[in-house]
A protein has these predicted regions:
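Hydrophobic alpha-helical segments of secondary membrane carriers
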Residues: 144-148, 203-206, 298, 423-427
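C-terminal module of multi-pass small-molecule transporters
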Residues: 19, 74, 79-89, 97, ...
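A gly/Pro-rich, aromatic-decorated transmembrane alpha-helix motif that marks the paired
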Residues: 147, 151-167, 216, 220, ...
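A membrane-interface helix-boundary motif in multi-pass transporters
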Residues: 165-174, 229-251, 324, 445-508
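Hydrophobic transmembrane-helix bundles of small-molecule transporters
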Residues: 165-297, 492-495
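Transmembrane-helix bundle of Major Facilitator Superfamily
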Residues: 2-190, 342, 346, 353, ...
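Transmembrane-helix exit segments and adjacent C-terminal regions of multi-pass membrane proteins
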Residues: 1-21, 249, 267-272, 278, ...
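Transmembrane core module of solute transporters
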Residues: 12-64, 68, 168, 220, ...
């Protein structure tokens, strides 16, 4: 069956098309989480400084988040499979470049290039599914897509720990080569090309400029605000030939102002171009669709807390409980199992009670799982004490991720799938960046309070307790095992546990707010997608 935007596949072939799309998403999610495990080894073997290590992650996040909307629009205009394949090639080549790198600069540059590839893969993968699947099969495809994200986020530490421990850090990136080859062949053979044939009426150069600059500025500020100071620079910033001195107006503040101003300019430019009938990088009229507008609000809010768990829990397990990276990955597998179980049941449940209800059940399970983890965390808890709560959290992620994606895209025109997919991905990324900034600050403040308090209660002099607290906070707990004195180690571990509990409860509050926001969604969203639906005009 053909549509104006491409081909609706029927029979078994559509499920063959799902395989390379899901594997492509799995690859970028796996890579994003593997890096956290590999960083300590990179610091030792490549000579990365703490700042370099942070930029290995930040460079990827910046290019990824800032280019999602542009990549989504390019997919609609030039072909969703084409952009998916180009992104795949860029990602695999940059993975090889990371593995071959022998200096901080080359690693950071290659990671930034990886972000470019990932930004092309993610929105085009969703828009491919949205354009080639319809009805019940679309819900099932979204369920697989959502479970892939949740499962790979949990499996990343396990895979990274295994490859780094048994082989070398290079293989944590080289593993993308065989996966990429399989995905490339599958995409070329099974995935049909789809595009918006009505979009080829000029390039929105200003839209591309303002959207990229706006998201780059805002996301950079959110990532680096805690480190460099939100208004006044607390330390010198250096990036290649650029140096920003401490004591002056912070580069974070300037970046945030430029980013917000660019996004405001983007709104005016896009409204003007729509009124003139010209091509736009993003059609603002999509926000007149209730399921799309409310769904993006939910995506942003729930992402504030959804990924905070994967940020803090590995630190706790390795610093306080002294688990290895591989052992930590095994514990986190419970999350992946829960996510895959939920993906199998979610689509069928959505047909019976509606996707919005399944989404709300999922977010409720997420919140309960995080709260349970918050209360379970202690200096003596073992892996089995955390596994049930991780499994519950994984069930929630599996139910919520796919259903929210389906709801957001349920009433958007197939021809604008790339734009819509990119916006929901951007909402999640911006939410995750804000959440990481808030939860990171919460962790640091918690460490400063609880570690200092527990050390002094253990009889450590105030001045020494303050010094130890600074060491623990600056290392995000990694210095705890090396503190020596068992009394000090126990007190610092107790303080870190209390700080982690606080972070978990704050994350649960954010997920709960996302649950409350979900009641803004139309109850019948995404039950059956009507072909030929057109967005509201004007």
């Amino acid at each position: 069956m053909s549509t104006a935007a491409g081909t609706i596949l029927t029979g078994k072939r559509r499920w063959f098309a799902l395989i390379p799309v899901a594997l492509g998403v799995a690859m970028i999610i796996l890579d994003a989480t593997v890096v956290n495990v590999v960083l300590p080894t990179l610091i030792k073997e490549v000579g990365l400084t703490t700042t370099d290590a942070e930029w290995v992650t930040a460079a990827y996040s910046l290019t990824f988040a800032s280019l999602l909307i542009v990549a989504g629009r390019l997919a609609d205009r030039f072909g969703r499979r084409l952009i998916f394949v180009i992104g795949l090639v860029v990602f695999v080549v940059s993975s090889v470049l990371v593995a071959m790198s022998d200096s901080p600069v080359s690693i950071i540059g290659a990671r930034a290039l990886q972000g470019v590839g990932a930004a092309m893969i993610l929105p085009s993968s969703l828009s491919i599914l949205n354009s080639v699947f319809v009805g019940k099969s679309r819900a099932a495809a979204f369920a697989v897509w959502g479970a892939t994200i949740g499962g790979m986020a949990a499996m990343g530490p396990l895979v990274g720990g295994w490859l780094t421990t048994d082989f070398s850090w290079h293989w944590a990136f080289l593993i993308n080569v065989p996966i990429g080859v399989v995905v490339l062949i599958g995409a070329l053979v099974f995935v049909p090309e789809t595009k918006d044939k009505a979009s080829a009426n000029g390039a929105d150069v200003l839209g591309i400029l303002f959207s990229t600059l706006g998201l780059l500025g805002v996301v950079f500020a959110l990532i680096e605000g805690q480190r460099y100071g939100w208004v006044i620079a607390t330390q010198e910033f250096t990036a290649g030939p650029i140096t920003w001195s401490a004591g002056a107006i912070s580069i974070v503040f300037v970046s945030l102002i430029v980013g917000v101003a660019s996004l405001v300019a983007l709104l005016f430019v896009e409204r003007s171009r729509v009124a003139s009938g010209k091509a736009v990088i993003f059609d603002l009229r999509l926000f007149k669709i209730r399921s799309f507008a409310a769904g993006n609000v939910v995506a942003l809010v729930v992402s504030l807390g959804e990924f905070g768990l994967l940020f803090t829990l590995p630190l706790f397990l390795q610093s306080v409980r002294a688990y290895t990276a591989l052992e930590t990955g095994v514990i986190l597998l419970a999350l992946a199992v829960g996510s895959f179980v939920a993906s199998g049941a979610g689509a069928a449940m959505a047909q019976r009670i509606g996707p919005v209800r399944v989404l709300q059940i999922g977010m409720a399970l997420e919140a309960l799982g995080i709260i349970g983890l918050g209360f379970a965390i202690s200096t003596t808890v073992g892996g089995w004490g955390l596994v049930p709560w991780l499994f519950l959290y994984g069930l929630g992620v599996g139910f919520a991720t796919a259903q929210l994606t389906g709801v957001i895209l349920s009433e958007t025109p197939v021809a604008q799938s790339g734009q819509a997919s990119a916006m929901q991905s951007t909402s999640r990324q911006v939410g995750a960046a804000i959440g990481t900034a808030i939860l990171g600050t919460t962790l640091l403040l918690g460490l400063g309070h609880f570690v200092n308090k527990d050390l002094q209660e253990a009889g450590v002099p105030s001045a020494q307790a303050e010094q130890i607290t600074q060491v623990v906070a600056s290392s995000a707990g990694q210095a705890i095992p090396g503190l020596g004195d068992p009394v000090i180690v126990e007190a610092a571990s107790q303080g870190f546990s209390s700080a982690t509990k606080t972070v978990s409860l704050v994350a649960a509050i954010f997920v709960t707010l996302g649950l409350l926001a979900s009641f803004l969604l139309p109850r019948n969203a995404a039950r059956i997608r009507a072909e030929g639906y057109e967005p509201p005009k004007g």
